[in-house]
């Protein structure tokens, strides 16, 4: 059996739907998942939620051991210097347990909500890394770009450098991730696409840059429900994740896989069925699988987490 780390991707903690504060909910959930045996979780920064890194600063101070990654932070709304400053400060609090996932968000968000052009995404990400990566490594940045310029250095002694992941799906962004970062974070991407497109593109770029294949990782995320009511779970997945079938970047991944919608990408079934689907992902070259549990009942989510823990390698 090919080894694959199992993590969780948490959604809904920051939006107030839990009925309490986002900080309290995050601390409670991270402590529970740590005690259950999970080593890492990923948390998204949605455009209308409270600030993820601020909440994680509180949570890391209260909860030990467990690792947390941002999955992902959009780069357009903060300068590389500001993000490096925040990420290093957070990782100092976390004692090196933080991973920084960044991405381009989506045109409908950047242009309609923020009034920021989505043009030249590859150039924007490359120039952003030109400033961000030296600063995270404790070096001075001197990067003059068309979309962003970063100069200067930070003084945050003792802060560990966080791993940086890109939410890379297209070939050029995957190549950039392979050359310069710890890897890619994928969503709504199935095993065939991961095996034939994502993994090879990422690792070939790493090799061309003189990096070992082990320097980059594929961290894939999909909805998961261990259940005996497959029809109900598929209907819920189709409704809850409908927006992702409409966003161009994820729609392209669903089309590559031959999926009609997010309900086809979701991993649904009893313990044996879900375990077989996880085997497919591991065989496809996935290094880490971050599950989004979406069963509406606490019992159903607990059943799913129990199965996931048996698969963590």
Description of each model-found segment:
Residues 1-313:
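Active-site-adjacent structural elements that line small-molecule/cofactor binding pockets in enzymes
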């Amino acid at each position: 059996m090919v080894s694959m780390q199992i993590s969780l991707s948490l959604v809904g903690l920051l939006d107030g739907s839990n009925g309490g504060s986002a900080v309290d909910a995050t601390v409670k959930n991270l402590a529970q998942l740590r005690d259950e045996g999970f080593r890492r979780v990923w948390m998204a920064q949605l455009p209308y939620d409270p600030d993820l890194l601020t909440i994680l600063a509180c949570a890391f101070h209260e909860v030990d051991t467990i690792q947390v990654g941002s999955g992902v932070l959009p780069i357009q709304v903060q300068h590389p210097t500001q993000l490096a400053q925040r990420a290093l400060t957070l990782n100092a609090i976390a004692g090196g347990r933080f991973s920084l996932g960044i991405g381009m968000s989506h045109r409908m968000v950047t242009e309609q909500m923020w009034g920021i052009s989505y043009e030249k995404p590859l150039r924007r990400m490359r120039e952003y890394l030109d400033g961000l990566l030296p600063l995270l490594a404790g070096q001075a940045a001197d990067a003059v770009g068309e979309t962003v310029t970063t100069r200067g250095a930070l003084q945050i002694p003792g802060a560990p450098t966080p791993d940086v992941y890109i939410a890379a799906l297209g070939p050029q962004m995957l190549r950039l991730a392979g050359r310069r970062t710890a890897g890619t974070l994928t969503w709504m991407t199935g095993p065939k696409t991961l095996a034939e497109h994502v993994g090879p593109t990422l690792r070939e770029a790493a090799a061309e840059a003189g990096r070992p294949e082990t320097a980059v990782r594929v961290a894939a995320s999909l909805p998961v429900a261990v259940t005996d009511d497959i029809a109900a779970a598929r209907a819920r997945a189709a409704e809850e994740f409908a927006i992702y079938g409409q966003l161009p970047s994820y729609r392209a991944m669903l089309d590559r896989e031959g999926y009609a919608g997010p309900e086809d990408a979701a991993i649904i079934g009893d313990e044996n069925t879900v375990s077989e689907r996880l085997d497919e992902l591991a065989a496809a070259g996935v290094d880490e699988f971050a599950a989004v549990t979406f069963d509406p009942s606490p019992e159903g989510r607990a059943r799913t987490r129990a199965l996931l823990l048996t698969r963590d390698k």
